[in-house]
Amino acid sequence: MSTWLLPENIADVLPSEARKIEELRRHLLDRFRSYGYEMVMPPLLEYIESLLTGGGHDLNLRTFKLVDQLSGRTLGLRADITPQVARIDAHLLNRQGVTRLCYAGNVAHTRPRGLHATREQIQIGAEIYGHAGLEADLEIQQLMLDALRLAGLAKVRLDLCHAGVLAALIEAEPAAAELGQSLYDALAGKDVPRLVELTANLTPVIRDALRALPTLYGDASVLDEARARLPNAPAIARALDDLAFLASQVEGAEVMIDLADLRGYAYHSGVMFSAYVDGVPNAVARGGRYDHVGQAYGRARAATGFSLDLREVARISPVEARSSAILAPWQHDEALRVSVAALRDAGEVVIQALPGHEHDLDEFAFDRVLVERNGNWVVEARA
């Protein structure tokens, strides 16, 4: 085996792609800050018990595990930063009011999420803690749409779901709870034949409701159909009311209702949402409410947030990274050194061509040159 080969679904990020990713990261973090979100940096490794707390079966399967050579305990290489940020809010910050936090960092997955997906993502996201009202859900959804707009993804479809619908159905039918992961997988995959098989022995009301979920997809009017086909339980009525409110308030995206879009259901407790764009089969961003996760760290807090993979969003973004630069000669000249330093301080990219390599600079678009005119170094358009 060649020594330079990388593991499957792991890849280097080359200069042009890295530049685009980094510029997008900076733009998004600046936008998060403009909303009042504070940056946190959780560790890449944690003890596995802490890392998987409240994360469910799926997170466990996606997490790389290794043995700590100092303590002998099992460590996990994070697959999702969201639970780590919940731990920081609940256990370290210990604030009583609303807290807004954001983050950006690498995560690793044991298996790829899709056919061509990478197992090492650059996850960026934002979370609100301390407010249980729909105002927080609306703010975080608008922030996600704002982030996608900054990436040049103007035509976005926002799919809304609610974990409370399935939770209420399972609570009403103990036999449904015993189906566990199989029921969730069938719903999330819209595998109707499998769903029919799994629900065959349930009471008719719950059976029919579960079988209806994959078909309850469409614009906000599908909520009327949901009210007619699902049990008239208070928890279900509240969930549908929440979705109706958010669907009427979201701006800048086509809003759809999908009551079977349950990815991440294991730790979500309320409204869930996903963003889709044309030409991309999977969601480009996901989020939702997870009020109970903080309880595992000693303090239950209302919480909602979203995250996306910077590498994937940068790949599909039509916005090109700024690669223009000023070409300057390499000379032992104090005035030249001062001019180059001043331009760089002003935010310009200035590249000095090393002797003998004046024609090797293909990575940048040199639209200007630094030339000497009458004893002064000035920037001119490149011919």
Swiss-Prot record:
Record-stated family: Belongs to the class-II aminoacyl-tRNA synthetase family. HisZ subfamily.
Record has Cytoplasm as a keyword: yes
Cell compartment(s), UniProt: Cytoplasm
GO terms classed as biological process: histidyl-tRNA aminoacylation; L-histidine biosynthetic process
Presence of keyword Transmembrane: no
One of the record's GO cellular component terms: cytoplasm
InterPro entries: aa-tRNA-synth_II/BPL/LPL, HisRS-like_core, HisRS/HisZ, HisZ
CDD domains: HisRS-like_core
Domain of life of the organism encoding this protein: Bacteria
Organism placement in taxonomy: Bacteria, Pseudomonadati, Pseudomonadota, Betaproteobacteria, Burkholderiales
Name recorded for this polypeptide: ATP phosphoribosyltransferase regulatory subunit
Oligomer and partners: Heteromultimer composed of HisG and HisZ subunits.
Pathway field: Amino-acid biosynthesis; L-histidine biosynthesis; L-histidine from 5-phospho-alpha-D-ribose 1-diphosphate: step 1/9
Molecular functions per Gene Ontology: histidine-tRNA ligase activity
Sorted UniProt keywords: Amino-acid biosynthesis, Cytoplasm, Histidine biosynthesis
Other remarks in the entry: This function is generally fulfilled by the C-terminal part of HisG, which is missing in some bacteria such as this one.
Reported function: Required for the first step of histidine biosynthesis. May allow the feedback regulation of ATP phosphoribosyltransferase activity by histidine.
Organism: Paraburkholderia phytofirmans (strain DSM 17436 / LMG 22146 / PsJN) (Burkholderia phytofirmans)
